[in-house]
Every structure is written in structure tokens, then in C-alpha cells.
């Protein structure tokens, strides 16, 4: 009999852990939680791992299977040297950054669809990174002290209530989409919040207070704007880890002795909705 090269690879989930001998690694790591793979090897590899797992271990090797998209050119064609349509990821990283390429691929990773990659899309997400960097500079220029905002600040001003409510709403939907493996939706959710709600609306509306003489209002806006921005960095970190970590370290955001952003807890909090919140949101939607 002749077996193809994929046959023995079906044993991989447990053969790599010392099987057929029983040991602590096999007990700890089998079964695992999720397998990430492409649709082109579902039959050749994934199906056989499940069949062998059930046969020899009496358990399926993983709970979830995440089938990721394949990357094609902007017209949906398979990349090949003969067609001359290959996009070198290293060149894109050198030109636009690893985070820009990473965010592009995540935002386009819709279930059941291949990624039609173009340089213009990567360039667009590079602009998003610039937007985030400029927002950080705006806060620093306006004397927003990040290290005084580890706890949710007291919120009285309407625009602050609005942006805090938007933050919690975004956090909840991003969290749900990540758990559901909808990374494209999660990326778009946080993108919309940062670019439109925070940068386009909140920052611009807050300028009228920051440039006023109302010291009490100025203090609240400084605290809320920096608090929200810190939560933004945490929300964005799974998508764009390099620039968010860089901003975090530059601002020395080391609350609770957690020097690195990657060690920080996921944002928590409940939305403080009231009549004024709804009125501000309605006004913004109308404009």
C-alpha cells in the first residue's frame, strides 16, 4: 500500500506530545483549544487529525477550527511569479510598517472570503497609525497626565459622558467579536471608534473646553481624554502591538508596576448612559 505524505501528519496533535506513552504533556496539552488553518488542507490534514484523534485518544484534538482566508492580489487572482502580481510583505512592512500590514489583513479577514490585498489599503491603515500618533501628541501638548488616570475619572460634562459610553460600547462589541473569531469586525469596530468618535469628534469638541478659562472643566477633560486614550491603546494592542507599545512606553504608562502594555488587563467598566448622553449622540449623528 502507498500512503500520501499527509497520512502520518494526522497523528501530529498527540504524537508530538510523547504518544503512545502517557505523560504530563499529553494530559495537559491534548486536546487543545483552537486550530488555525487554510481551507485547502481541511481534507488532507484537519479531517485526518480529527479521525485519528477519535480513534487513538477518544477525543477530538481541538474544540474550534478557524479557517483563515488566503491572500490574493487586488483583483482576486492567485499570486505567482509568472503573472508578476506577487506582493512582497517584507517590502510593505519596510514601507508602511508591520502594524499597518497586520491591521490591513485583520480588517479584511472576513469568514469565507479571500483577502484581495492592495498597497493602497495598507497605505490607508498606515494613515490610521499616524492619526493615533497625532492624538497622543495632542494630549501631551494639552498637558494631559496619563499617570493620574488609572481609575475611571469622575464624569460630569456631556461630551465626556458620551465618549465614555462609546468606549464601553466599543469594548463590549470588540470583545465579543474576538471571542467569535470575527477579527475583521473587531478591527473595524475599534477603527471607527478611534478615528471617528475619538479623533474626529471628541478631540475637536474638547478643544473648546481646553482653550477656555474654566479650570474645573479643563481638569475633567484632561483626565477623561487621557483615560480614554489609555483604554484605546489597550483595545488596539492585539491588532497593532508595535506602535501601541511604543506610545505606552514613551508616556511611561506603568500603573500597578506593569511596565509593558502587553501585561495590562483588558478594559473594564459599565456604560453610564443618561438623557444627556443620548442627546449628544443624536446631535453627532445628525451632523
Regions found by a protein language model. Give the residues of each.
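Structured secondary-structure scaffolds
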Residues: 1-144, 163-206, 210-211, 223-236
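Acidic, turn-prone loop/beta-hairpin segments
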Residues: 73, 106, 145-172, 204-287
Amino acid at each position: 500500500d502507498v500512503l500520501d505524505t499527509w497520512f502520518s501528519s494526522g497523528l501530529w496533535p498527540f504524537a508530538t506530545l510523547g504518544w503512545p506513552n502517557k505523560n504530563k504533556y499529553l494530559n495537559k496539552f491534548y486536546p487543545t483549544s483552537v486550530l488555525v488553518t487554510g481551507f485547502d488542507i481541511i481534507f488532507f490534514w484537519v479531517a485526518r487529525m480529527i479521525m485519528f484523534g477519535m480513534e487513538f485518544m477518544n477525543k477530538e484534538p481541538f474544540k474550534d477550527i478557524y479557517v483563515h482566508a488566503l491572500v490574493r492580489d487586488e483583483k482576486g487572482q492567485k499570486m505567482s511569479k509568472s503573472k508578476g502580481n506577487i506582493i512582497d510583505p517584507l517590502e510593505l512592512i519596510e514601507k508602511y510598517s508591520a502594524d499597518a500590514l497586520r491591521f490591513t489583513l485583520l480588517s479584511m479577514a472576513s469568514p469565507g472570503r479571500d483577502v484581495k490585498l492592495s498597497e493602497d489599503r495598507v497605505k490607508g491603515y498606515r494613515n490610521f497609525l499616524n492619526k493615533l500618533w497625532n492624538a497622543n501628541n495632542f494630549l501631551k501638548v494639552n498637558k494631559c497626565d496619563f499617570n493620574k488616570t488609572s481609575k475611571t475619572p469622575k464624569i460630569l460634562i456631556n461630551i465626556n459622558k458620551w465618549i465614555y459610553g462609546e468606549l464601553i460600547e466599543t469594548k463590549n462589541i470588540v470583545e465579543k467579536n474576538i471571542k467569535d473569531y470575527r477579527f475583521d469586525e473587531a478591527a473595524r469596530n475599534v477603527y471607527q471608534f478611534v478615528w471617528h468618535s475619538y479623533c474626529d469628534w471628541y478631540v475637536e469638541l474638547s478643544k473648546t473646553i481646553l482653550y477656555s478659562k474654566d479650570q474645573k472643566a479643563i481638569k475633567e477633560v484632561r483626565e477623561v481624554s487621557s483615560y480614554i486614550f489609555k483604554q484605546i491603546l489597550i483595545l488596539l494592542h492585539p491588532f497593532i502591538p508595535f506602535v501601541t507599545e511604543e506610545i505606552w512606553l514613551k508616556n511611561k504608562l506603568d500603573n500597578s508596576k506593569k511596565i509593558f502594555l502587553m501585561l495590562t488587563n483588558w478594559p473594564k467598566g459599565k456604560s453610564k448612559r443618561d438623557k444627556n448622553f443620548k442627546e449628544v449622540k443624536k446631535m453627532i449623528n445628525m451632523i
